[in-house]
Design a protein with these regions (language model features):
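Anion-binding alpha/beta catalytic cores of soluble intermediary-metabolism enzymes, centered on
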Residues: 1-175
């Protein structure tokens, strides 16, 4: 998903969120691919991607299989995409709030400034984008299906006519 929120300064706030609609329980390697494709898509929409592999843990503050999956995926992604700013595993507050980032991961170039979010599974991703859309006043465009031979996109059953029109424009632009 690409999410856009107009700001008072006239510059839109633009975010990318993946995977919110297709991969139910992506593996570490699938998350690496999702991150790379999401970063490339973000660039198309004017985002200089700063990728956060989201978790309930920041740099080892929590334990468990899900934490390990996101930490390992972030490590593999940094190896595969050495020029892409990547942090993980990281909690959402540390990913977006500079004050929190200074406390939880002060050495990170991404923490506090992330704009491309990789969720651990479809549950978290779908909930996350809908919270941003419904409570954060972001317009959500997607899902934008990546990694295919041709652009193909989907729409939420809750979408409106403007979102249908916007997705048609996005699909044509990706062709």
């Amino acid at each position: 998903f690409i999410l856009v929120r107009p700001s008072a300064t006239g510059e839109n706030e633009v975010l990318a969120m993946s995977d919110c609609a297709i991969n139910i329980h992506p593996t570490e390697d699938e998350l690496v691919e999702i991150a790379g494709e999401s970063a490339e898509c973000a660039k198309i929409f004017g985002i200089d991607p700063k990728v956060a592999f989201l978790s309930y843990s920041t740099l080892g503050s929590g334990k468990g299989e899900d934490v390990d999956k996101m930490r390992n995926a972030a490590h593999k992604a940094r190896e595969k995409y050495p020029n892409l700013p990547i942090e993980g595993e990281i909690q959402f507050d540390a990913a977006v709030a500079p004050r929190v980032a200074r406390t939880k991961c002060p050495q990170s170039e991404v923490a506090g400034h992330a704009n491309t979010f990789i969720f651990p599974d479809i549950n978290a991703g779908n909930i996350g984008y809908k919270i941003a859309q419904r409570l954060g006043n972001f317009e959500a465009y997607g899902p934008i299906l990546l990694g295919l031979n041709a652009p193909i996109n989907d729409l939420s059953r809750g979408c409106n006519a403007g979102e249908v029109y916007s997705m048609a424009i996005i699909t044509a632009a990706l062709a």
